[in-house]
Amino acid sequence: MCIRDRIAAGAESGCEICKELKTLDHYLVKRSQWIIGGDGASYDIGYGGLDHVIASGEDVNILVLDTEVYSNTGGQSSKSTPLGAIAQFAAQGKRIRKKDLGLMATTYGYVYVAQIAMGADQAQCLKAIREAEAYPGPSLIIAYAPCINHGLKAKGGMGKSQAEEAKAVECGYWHLWRYNPELAEEGKNPFSLDSKEPDWSKFHDFLLGEVRYLSVKKA
């Protein structure tokens, strides 16, 4: 029984203090707790901890800022770095594909999982965060986050990171989706693909707009 229910029960039983507290129970909101980290920690060196947390079934929210590289330490390749991208320790382009953290988390069946890109769809981003907060169990949101190590060629550089997110989704480089276990309990499909059908004709230009991929072509 939560504190609101206890106060309500006390008020109904005639407790004067509880009656007074009940007039203020709109201040008793659920505390929002989030663990925020990058892809290096979440996909790679701290994955064991992340997996332990989501497997626990506890009501905890995790937000992964996916830059697809170790941003804080100089741009080293991580398990989130995509196939072909140039980074430190992958000077000729990474030779193996990116780890699909979101898909792996959905296999538990009781973890809320979403993939977002605020610059591509703010409404979907907010919806995923609200659903994760409301879900009574572990939730994992993976957010695409352009990084200075990507080497954005667009005029304005990192000042255009939101536009870069939109391009990534439009061309099919990054997908927007949500997996809500509560829908499965209602007999519905728990998976929702929120991004539109990609315009694959723009995929090549998107890659050439970032030094991490353009350099592979020049090599």
Question: Where do the language-model regions lie?
Answer:
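Glycine/aspartate-rich loop-and-adjacent alpha/beta segment that forms the canonical ThDP
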Residues: C125-K218
